[in-house]
Amino acid sequence: MNCFRYSCQEFVSGRVSNVPREERFLDKVTTSDGTVGKALELLDRVAEKKRPVRFTELLADSPHPKATLHRLLRTLLRQEMLSYDRDRQTYSLGLRLVTLAHAAWRQSSLAPIARPFVDALAVRLDETIHLAQLDNGQVLYLDKRNAADPVEMFSQAGKTGPGYCTGIGKAMLAFLPDDQRRMAIQQQGYFAHTRHTITNASALSDELAIIREQGMAFDREEHETGIICVAVPILSSKGRPIGGLSLTSSTQRAALADLHKFASILHLQAKEISRAAEHWQFPSP
C-alpha cells in the first residue's frame, strides 16, 4: 500500500501529488512558517519529482538562498527524512517517512477495523469498493478493493482527493455538524475536473442537503470522466461521520441508475463497521 500522500507539509491533511497543478494551488488551505515549514515544503518538492533529484534542481525551484537550502537538506538527512546517493549526487525521500506513514495509518485509521467488511463487499458485488475518512474537508482513501475486472481510476489507499466532487466525499461532508460542514464547504477548491463538476459553494451546499435527506451520495462523472459511484457515510452512535463507503464503476459497465440498488447493502455494511468501531477513537473530521 502506498502510505504517502501528496503533502509532507500537511502530513495528516495533505493533497495528492498527481492532482492537477491548478487544483493544488486552489485547494491549498494553510501554509507553514519557520524552519519546520521550510523543511516540510522541501520534502514536498522532492516528493513531487517522483524520482531522485539533484541539488541544482531543488535550488532552481526553491525560494531560499543556497546556504539555507544546504542547511535544510543536512537537517533532513540527519533525521532520515531524506536519503542521499553519493554516486549519483541525488536526494530522495527517506525510509523514516515510511515508518511515520505506517504509524499514522495504524493509529488513526478505520481501515484495520473495516477491512473484513470491505473485502466481503468486493467479493459479493464484484465492483470497486472504497473506504475513506474526511481530512480537513478532503477525502483520505484508507482502503480499496478492485473488481475482478478492475477499472482504472484516480483513487488509491493512502491518497487524498477532493471532497466536493467525489461521492464518498459528499456522503461524509453532508453529515458533518452544521458549523463544520459550512467550514468544509468553504475549504473546497472547486476545480472543474470534468464538465459535471460542482464548481461553487452554493451548489455544493444544495447537493449536501439532498444527500442528508436521501442518506446516500452519487458521483456523476464529477471527478473523472466515465467514473460513477454511490456512497454512504459511516456514522458514529452520535450521528457523526467517522468514514464513508462507496461502490465505484464506469459508465461502460453500468448506468448511474443501476447503482441505486447497492445503496442498501452499503448502508448495512456501514452500520456493521460503525458497531465494530464503537470503542475506537478517531480524529474529528
Regions found by a protein language model. Give the residues of each.
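Short, structured helix-loop boundary elements
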Residues: 32-36, 90, 94, 107, ...
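Cysteine/selenocysteine-centered motifs that mediate thiol-based redox chemistry or coordinate metal-sulfur cofactors
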Residues: 180-185, 189, 270-285
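Extended hydrophobic
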Residues: 197-270
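Short, solvent-exposed cationic patches
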Residues: 164-166, 260-281
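N-terminal helix-turn-helix
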Residues: 2-112, 271-279
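Amphipathic alpha-helical effector-binding/dimerization core
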Residues: 87-188
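C-terminal regulatory/oligomerization modules of transcriptional regulators
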Residues: 2-15, 144, 150-156, 216
